[in-house]
From Swiss-Prot:
Mg(2+) binds at S168, E210. ATP binds at G161, D162, S163, G164, L165, G166, K167, S168. This is HPr kinase/phosphorylase. InterPro entries: HPr(Ser)_kin/Pase, Hpr_kin/Pase_C, Hpr_kin/Pase_Hpr_N, P-loop_NTPase, Ser_kin/Pase_Hpr-like_N_sf. One of its GO terms (molecular function) is protein serine/threonine/tyrosine kinase activity. The active site is at H146, K167, D185, R250. Its cofactor is Mg(2+). The lineage of its organism: Bacteria, Pseudomonadati, Pseudomonadota, Betaproteobacteria, Burkholderiales. GO terms for biological process: regulation of carbohydrate metabolic process.
Length: 322
């Protein structure tokens, strides 16, 4: 992962308003950030932001009231030693939180070493929580997939398939039936948690849907505010195919999945043919997926019913289990 764009300046710009940050000194060190090794070795964003801790030198160090009080109780010699050790570790930047006054020696050393020093009236815990969430978002695995991403019955559904199969037309039909558009053509996905992938629309394509023969349609203007969504969690992939290939199964015994950013996402395959109402089929697939998420598997229930019928000697469907 390229971490060159993640530095003190970018983090300050993105969080200054939210965290009420002020840049006290060390402006020359605006390019300070995280090394690739530090990010690669971090198990989570918690490894990159935390309370003052000299054991983890390469993370963002936050000094709250407890840390400042501890510093004030030290002897001059211990203060100087701790400050020298802290600055020598070259953290990306320091934050003095809780409205506490930054110790003069800390300000002096940050100025001399070009170490960015921020201050904020917010508590250290609030600053750490916010920065951890921010870091987890910008460092999360990302991917851009081709397709139409929709909110169907509250579920994030990605329509995929070869060009010319009518994905955008199908998306338009589903939007006209009351569902919402997230993104068309290019969808930005990011894995923000261990069990979900979130999809958004690139800013350039916001609210737009391209339909052959009609060109670009502004869905928000045509259908209203409720016809578009800012983001959705990806739960289902619907692949459109022109004709079934050798792997197509009429009644798949096992659920199909597609790996997206290391997370298995449920997948259904629908054949595109004349006379088929694809919008109804997609809605049915979504409803069936919702049932499966609730533990209701229609195919498994039918197989159990069939097995019981074959085992019943009085059944009109006698058979022998293999």
């Amino acid at each position: 992962m390229d971490t060159s764009s993640i530095n003190a300046q970018s983090i300050f710009d993105d969080n200054a308003a939210t965290l009420k940050l002020s840049w006290l000194t060390g402006h020359e060190g605006w390019e300070r950030g995280f090394s690739s090794d530090t990010v690669a070795n971090a198990t989570s964003s918690a490894d990159l932001v935390g309370h003052l801790n000299l054991i983890h030198p390469n993370r963002i160090q936050v000094l709250g009231e407890a840390e400042i009080d501890y510093y004030q109780r030290q002897t001059d010699e211990d203060r100087s030693r701790h400050m020298a050790e802290l600055i020598a570790l070259e953290p990306p930047f320091l934050v003095v939180a809780g409205g506490a006054a930054a110790p003069p020696e800390l300000v002096l050393r940050c100025t001399r070493s070009s170490t960015p020093l921020f201050t904020t009236p917010m508590s250290a815990a609030a600053v750490i929580d916010s920065l951890r969430l921010y870091m987890s978002r910008i460092l999360a695995p990302r991917a851009t997939l081709h397709g139409v991403f929709l909110d169907i019955l509250g579920m994030g559904v990605l329509l995929t398939g070869d060009s010319g199969l009518g994905k955008s037309e199908l998306g338009l039909e589903l939007i006209s039936r009351g569902h919402g558009l997230v993104a068309d053509d290019a969808v930005d996905f990011v894995r923000l948690g261990p069990d979900f992938v979130e999809g958004r629309c690139p800013p350039l394509l916001q609210n737009l849907l391209e339909v052959r023969g009609l060109g670009l349609l502004d869905i928000k203007t045509i259908f209203g505010e409720t016809a578009v969504r800012r983001k959705m969690k990806l739960k289902l992939i619907v692949q459109l195919v022109r004709r079934p290939d050798g792997e197509f199964q009429r009644l798949p015994l096992e659920s199909q999945t597609v790996d997206v950013l290391g997370l298995p996402i449920s997948k259904v395959t629908i054949q595109v043919a004349a006379g088929r109402n694809l919008a109804v089929l997609v809605e049915a697939a979504v409803r069936n997926t919702i049932l499966q998420l609730r533990g209701i598997d229609t195919l498994r229930d039918f197989m159990d019913r069939q097995r019981l019928a074959m085992q019943d000697p009085d059944s009109q469907f006698p058979g022998k289990l293999v």
